[in-house]
Regions:
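An extended, acidic
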Residues: 22-144
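Extended Lys/Arg-rich, glycine-bearing segments that form polyanion-binding/interaction patches
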Residues: 10-11, 19-21
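Short acidic/polar mixed-charge low-complexity motifs
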Residues: 3-5, 19-20, 135
Length: 144
């Protein structure tokens, strides 16, 4: 968006503009900056838990780019990104999810198992990427 560079390899280190970074340590929803893709048309079950969750988040946002918002979780600019609708293709999000995992963040696929993703198939995904397991588990506690 503004010339920032986010890089990683499989050594568990994520660089933001050349500096080593880690996800945020915030573990209270009311203090968290959480991005949510609000497109929930035709998803009645998902609407219920999302509305309950949004009541607990002080700073819900949506920038319009799942990859950027997921990458922001890895570098500590955001505490979580929630993609409720399974409409992201592998190449839309896999790089950013790699950043979150490399940085020590938390990822939960909502419609698939992350270990069974076949990059050659045209699957679509929904997921929660969080800065830590505490925030991730709090978010998932709203999903029934």
């Amino acid at each position: 968006v503004n010339g920032d560079r986010i890089l990683s390899n499989d050594n568990g280190k994520v660089l933001f503009n050349g500096n080593s970074v880690k996800p945020s340590s915030t573990n209270i929803l009311d203090d968290a900056y959480i991005s949510v893709n609000m497109r929930i048309r035709d998803m009645d079950n998902e609407k219920k838990w999302l509305i309950s969750l949004l009541r607990e988040i002080r700073y819900p946002r949506f920038l319009g780019s799942a990859a950027l918002e997921t990458a922001y979780v890895a570098v500590g600019k955001s505490n979580a990104f929630i993609q409720i609708i399974p409409n992201l293709r592998t190449f839309d999000c896999i790089g950013a999810l790699f950043l979150v995992k490399s940085a020590g963040g938390w990822i939960e696929f909502l419609n698939n198992d992350i270990d069974n993703v076949d990059l050659r198939k045209p699957e679509r995904f929904s997921y929660v990427a969080a800065s830590n397991s505490t925030i991730g588990d709090l978010i998932m506690s709203f999903r029934t």
